[in-house]
From Swiss-Prot:
Keywords: Chloroplast, Plastid, Ribonucleoprotein, Ribosomal protein, RNA-binding, rRNA-binding. It comes from Cyanidium caldarium. Gene3D superfamilies: 3.30.1440.10. This is Large ribosomal subunit protein uL5c. The gene is rpl5. It is found in: Plastid, Chloroplast. It comes from the Eukaryota. GO terms for biological process: translation.
Amino acid sequence: MSGGNLQHLYFNKIRVELQKQFEYTNVHQIPKLTKITLNRGLGTLYQQSPKVFESSVSDLMLITGQKPRFNKSKKSIAGFKLREGTVVGLSVTLRRKKMYAFLEKLIHFSLPAARDFRGLSTKNFDGLGNYNLGIKEHAIFPEIDFDKIDHSYGLNICIVTTANNDIEGKALLKFLGMPFKD
């Protein structure tokens, strides 16, 4: 999937609709997607089982199409048995075509495949038009073979926009096809 359909839809139809709805005088005021970040905290899995760590890296690579960045601890904390420099999470930042391809896959395939999915909450906006979404199982993505999963884990997905407030951000994501409850 190229993501061209959603990107084409945004540039040809959604921008015009948003400009009419919010009465923007300048095309640069129209909200757009900036990036999508995926984060996965590893906790103590990295220390306990290297196999789970390697599968987490490969699964995130399959889901996004690019290699994840390793987030390392900044200081040692004895209570958590954590040393400075230990990998504590993985993150991927998607932009441009990969961002639109991932969003299209998320909206049309992954979210409807989630168990008991009834729509996304509109309370997950941060006040600046950015949307945060937590996924409990990474197996909802079509690239992941459910039979080969050793350990199921969740992801945090942050959709960053140039919107000034939640109303503009919600309108943008709704036009893009995000399945909100309301």
